[in-house]
């Protein structure tokens, strides 16, 4: 199970440029988890530095549909988790032969990237003789994006950020939380990368399964509803690196967020985890923002 390809690994799969992205779509679709719709969606994306990333839809039975992770959301979250800076091209399919534009939800989600209007999307319908790339700008010409609200120099999605958060409880935190195996350290590190410029309520999650730590952070949309929660983001990491493990094998989850804020993840995270990982130990740790920045 592979969700990230270096340029040389992509070339071995026959992907040497944007027009070759469909060569990996079957692999992407095979990794989707779609027990509700049974429609396995795959997304293949190319970065400005030549890496190729896969995205898949992930659905959760017995939960509201808004918990669903769209393949395009998975793809961008996968980029963020791997510190990629720029997505340039994307191909999305549910059939392996017909490629279409992202849904409106994902078109809006993608607006958080600085180069969103220039992202090229493969449109391919063999029966109609259509095989071309279209810019996201052409698919969403009158966009509502970060520039409608945020200052011009604001850090956007996939750009470096540090929310300057520390835990409220003065427990010892490892000097390099990115490399340690403590869930509280990894969850705090995730929260510090959280993209929440509108609510200013960053949060992060770390979870453990089989001794491995997975993490993710809240990714906000200017349109609010397309935002991706921190548990969902951590599950992107889990699906991408977990080797096919099931959600009910997760044993521990830690959420780090600020206390008494307008946007809290605790209640929805608890409901979510009660369904997908009922035996996990769920903890919430509060943090606060320092005056570092």
Curated annotation (Swiss-Prot):
Record keywords: Hydrolase, Metal-binding, Zinc
Catalyzed reactions: cytidine + H2O + H(+) = uridine + NH4(+); 2'-deoxycytidine + H2O + H(+) = 2'-deoxyuridine + NH4(+)
One Pfam family this sequence matches: dCMP_cyt_deam_1
Biological processes per GO annotation: cytidine deamination
GO molecular function: cytidine deaminase activity; zinc ion binding
Binding residues annotated for Zn(2+), in chain numbering: 70, 103, 106
Enzyme class: hydrolase
Comment on bound cofactor: Binds 1 zinc ion per subunit.
Cofactors required: Zn(2+)
Gene3D superfamilies assigned to the protein according to its UniProt record, in alphabetical order: Cytidine Deaminase, domain 2
Binding positions for substrate per the UniProt entry: 57-59
List of catalytic residues: 72
Residue ranges annotated for the CMP/dCMP-type deaminase domain, each copy included: 16-147, 178-293
Family statement: Belongs to the cytidine and deoxycytidylate deaminase family.
NCBIfam families found in the cross-reference section: cyt_deam_dimer, PRK09027.1
Subunit structure comment from the entry: Homodimer.
Function: This enzyme scavenges exogenous and endogenous cytidine and 2'-deoxycytidine for UMP synthesis.
UniProt-recorded name of the protein: Cytidine deaminase 6
Organism: Arabidopsis thaliana
